[in-house]
């Protein structure tokens, strides 16, 4: 998947820098991307476990944008192996410390330029889809498609449109962005797209995915489904 669109590339680079700097105090159980002093949607470790237990991700699992490890830990309990990919070396270091599972392999890569080297039984991403710029949405889902074995499943968790009331999103060069502040006062703009679950399911159906997207508590949604082209 190629970034292409220059505003999208700038947005992705700023977003990566923010998460590099946020890694040391990022919560393992939720998005926690609003920075110091802000209201945050979080998902407890028990909720992480319940969602992954429901998914039952056996075999080889790919986790995109693995972050500090809240979901990685639970995926590793079920899977034969987990490949955890993230653009941030600081997040990967935090994940290794938090998870410490022998069946997890870590890959540092820009997810907007990365290509899978094998196919997986399950592809999972938690709190990442809302950070995918509109211009990268279809290319991102082609990466997901290329990562899945025939009969494989994709699953994800994220904030939905109800969470938009906690944020202020502005279009910057056509990319929906939200302002985040670090503890030292520095500010960054990150991509933030709040999907309505029905709209997301319909959009994915147009791309030949059969994915059920349901609302959860606390302004979150979960999706699971299959590639109709497989």
Show the residue positions of the predicted features.
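A conserved beta-strand element that flanks and buttresses the S-adenosyl-L-methionine
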Residues: 124
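Short catalytic micro-motifs in class I SAM-dependent methyltransferases
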Residues: 127-128
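Class I SAM-dependent methyltransferase SAM/SAH-binding core
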Residues: 62-113
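Conserved Class I S-adenosyl-L-methionine
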Residues: 190-226
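A short glycine-rich, Lys/Arg-flanked "PGG" loop and its adjoining helix->strand segment in the class I
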Residues: 138-150
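Conserved beta-strand signature within the Rossmann-like core of class I S-adenosyl-L-methionine
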Residues: 151-159
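C-terminal alpha-helical "lid/dimerization" subdomain adjacent to the S-adenosyl-L-methionine
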Residues: 159-203
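Conserved class I S-adenosyl-L-methionine
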Residues: 2-56
